[in-house]
């Protein structure tokens, strides 16, 4: 998805890694997603070279994993499959949290995808080849780590098919968003609705959709 440059600051920092190779760290500040569904959390960061306690503000874990689920569906990267498989293996969210997780996925799917899809499809996951695990995932894991694609993929797909069984209100949110109408009250209420009702990315995408539809009708 192409975000106007005035809404984003992007910096690339080059460095030499422990192996003596040139690498880079890219940091992007996207002002269009500065509103969050859930309150931010304070998390401790453990750095081997720092003796003092360090804590940073972080997006709520549920929103992070909702975004990862959307990324997995959209780009089918091995690292996203690995992350969602770990979500299931370690039981990060219990049954009572699945409803909110689904709503977060629906929300971020609409604002974060190039095209709004009326339903979630997982066919691309079935086509992920084992060699992509070797080339794209294993190099960033601990030495000697192994990831068995077939059972992990099956487990993740089964989970997502159950999780993303949308109710009528959630489906209507997607339908309306695809027409350029942002109606967060179909997903949320109370404080959460207040948090997102003026979400800049959602409003920008809906404005853009309505403008494109209007131009096509002319």
What are these regions (language model features)?
Residues 1-218:
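Structured mid-to-C-terminal alpha-helical surface segments
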